[in-house]
C-alpha cells in the first residue's frame, strides 16, 4: 500500500511561526504562533526579535501538532523571500529534521505559496490557467502570470513600500496597534470617499509605488492632529483605503488586458480586506481568495503548495 503524501510545512519568513501537517493535500493541523505583540511598541517587525521567537516557537509548535513526525513523507520550508535571520532559523530547523528523519526536503517560495493558498479546501478542477496571481501582503505587493504550479512570471511589483506595510505605518500614525490593516478596514465607509482627497500614485503599470501616498497621508494626519483634540479617523481611513486599493486594481486591469488570464488567484494578508474583495468582484473574471485562516503567513500554505509540486512531478 502506497504511503500517503504527508508534508510538514514550515513558515518563518517574518513574525509568524507556522507549522502544518498536510496529508494528501488536506490540512490536518495548522499551528501559528505570532510574535506581533512584541513588535507593537516599534510599530513594525524587529528582525532580531522575530528570529529569536522562531527559535523558541518552532519547538513548541511541533509538540502542539500532536503528530508522529516519523510518519512524514516530506519536509517543506519557506526559503525566500523574507527576513534573513528568520529564514535561516526555519531552514536550519527543516534541514535538521530532514537529516534526522531521512526525509526529502523541499525549499518553497513564500509568495508562490501565498498565491496557491486560495486553492486550499477547493476543488482543484476550478483552477483555470493561465491565471493572474495577486500577492498583497505586509511585505510584498506583486502580480504574477501563473502558467502552471512550477512556472510563474513576475509582471508587476512594488518599487518601495508594500501595501500592507503602508497600512501599518498609517495606522501607527493614527494611534492604532500593529498590525493596523483590519482596524483601518473596519473604519471604511464608501460614502466618505471623495474625489482627489489623495492623489493616486502615477507609475508604470509594471511598478507600484506607495511612498508618495504614504507621505500625503502622514502629512494629512499631522494637520488633523494639530487642529483637533478628538478625532474621527473614518474619512481619512476611507479615502486612504480607496486610493491605495484602487491603484492596485488599476494595475490588475492593465495586466488583464495584456495577458488575457482565465481567472485570478489572490493571496496574502491584505487579501482579507473587504474593499479589495469587492473591487476584485467587479473585474468580470472568476477568482479565488484565500480563506481567512490562510491569508496571513502560515505553514499550511507551504505544505499545501509543496504537495501540489510533488503531485505534479508524479503526474
From Swiss-Prot:
It is found in: Cytoplasm. It catalyses: L-threonylcarbamoyladenylate + adenosine(37) in tRNA = N(6)-L-threonylcarbamoyladenosine(37) in tRNA + AMP + H(+). One of its GO terms (molecular function) is iron ion binding. Its main location: cytoplasm. GO terms for cellular component: cytoplasm. Substrate binds at residues 135-139, 168, 181, 185, 273. Keywords: Acyltransferase, Cytoplasm, Iron, Metal-binding, Transferase, tRNA processing. Its cofactor is Fe(2+). Fe cation binds at residues 110, 114, 297. GO terms for biological process: tRNA threonylcarbamoyladenosine modification. Binds 1 Fe(2+) ion per subunit. Belongs to the KAE1 / TsaD family. PANTHER family: TRNA N6-ADENOSINE THREONYLCARBAMOYLTRANSFERASE (PTHR11735), TRNA N6-ADENOSINE THREONYLCARBAMOYLTRANSFERASE, MITOCHONDRIAL (PTHR11735:SF6). NCBIfam families: gcp_kae1, T6A_TsaD_YgjD. This is tRNA N6-adenosine threonylcarbamoyltransferase. It comes from Mycoplasma genitalium (strain ATCC 33530 / DSM 19775 / NCTC 10195 / G37) (Mycoplasmoides genitalium).
Amino acid at each position: 500500500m502506497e504511503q500517503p503524501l504527508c508534508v510538514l510545512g514550515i513558515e518563518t519568513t517574518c513574525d509568524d511561526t507556522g507549522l502544518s501537517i498536510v496529508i494528501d493535500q488536506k490540512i490536518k493541523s495548522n499551528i501559528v504562533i505570532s510574535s506581533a505583540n512584541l513588535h507593537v511598541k516599534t510599530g513594525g517587525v524587529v528582525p532580531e526579535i522575530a528570529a529569536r521567537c522562531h527559535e523558541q516557537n518552532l519547538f513548541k509548535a511541533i509538540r502542539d501538532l500532536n503528530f508522529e513526525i516519523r510518519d512524514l513523507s516530506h519536509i517543506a520550508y519557506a526559503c525566500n523571500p523574507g527576513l534573513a535571520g528568520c529564514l535561516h532559523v526555519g531552514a536550519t530547523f527543516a534541514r535538521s529534521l530532514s537529516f534526522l528523519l531521512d526525509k526529502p526536503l523541499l525549499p518553497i517560495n513564500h509568495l508562490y505559496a501565498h498565491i496557491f493558498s486560495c486553492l486550499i479546501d477547493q476543488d482543484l478542477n476550478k483552477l483555470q490557467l493561465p491565471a493572474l496571481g495577486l500577492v498583497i501582503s505586509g511585505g510584498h505587493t506583486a502580480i504574477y502570470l501563473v502558467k502552471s504550479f512550477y512556472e510563474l512570471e513576475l509582471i508587476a511589483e512594488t518599487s518601495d513600500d508594500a501595501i500592507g506595510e503602508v497600512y501599518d505605518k498609517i495606522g501607527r500614525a493614527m494611534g492604532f496597534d500593529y498590525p493596523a490593516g483590519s482596524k483601518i478596514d473596519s473604519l471604511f465607509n464608501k460614502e466618505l470617499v471623495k474625489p482627489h482627497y489623495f492623489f493616486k500614485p502615477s507609475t508604470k503599470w509594471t511598478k507600484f509605488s506607495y511612498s508618495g501616498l504614504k507621505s500625503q497621508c502622514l502629512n494629512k494626519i499631522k494637520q488633523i492632529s494639530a487642529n483637533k483634540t478628538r478625532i474621527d479617523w473614518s474619512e481619512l481611513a476611507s479615502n486612504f483605503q480607496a486610493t491605495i486599493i484602487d491603484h492596485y486594481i488599476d494595475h490588475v486591469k492593465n495586466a488583464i488586458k495584456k495577458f488575457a488570464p482565465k481567472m485570478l488567484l489572490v493571496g496574502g494578508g491584505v487579501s482579507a480586506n473587504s474593499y479589495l474583495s469587492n473591487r476584485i468582484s467587479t473585474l468580470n473574471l472568476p477568482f479565488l481568495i484565500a480563506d481567512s485562516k490562510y491569508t496571513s503567513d502560515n505553514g499550511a500554505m507551504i505544505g499545501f503548495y509543496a504537495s501540489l509540486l510533488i503531485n505534479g512531478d508524479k503526474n
